[in-house]
Amino acid sequence: MKIKNSLKSLKTRHRENRLVRRKGRVYIINKLNPRFKARQG
């Protein structure tokens, strides 16, 4: 999982990327290709 300050550029890397908020943190998840997972931090 990548940890980035800004997820905007990571969101556009794959069309299946979804932006979700969990426990006050922002994540990008991708069920088809899990290598695109990222967390804002």
UniProtKB/Swiss-Prot annotation:
The keyword Ribonucleoprotein applies. This is Large ribosomal subunit protein bL36. GO terms for cellular component: ribonucleoprotein complex; ribosome. Pfam families: Ribosomal_L36. GO terms for biological process: translation. Coiled coil: none annotated. It comes from the Bacteria. GO terms for molecular function: structural constituent of ribosome. Keywords: Ribonucleoprotein, Ribosomal protein. It comes from Rhizobium meliloti (strain 1021). Belongs to the bacterial ribosomal protein bL36 family.
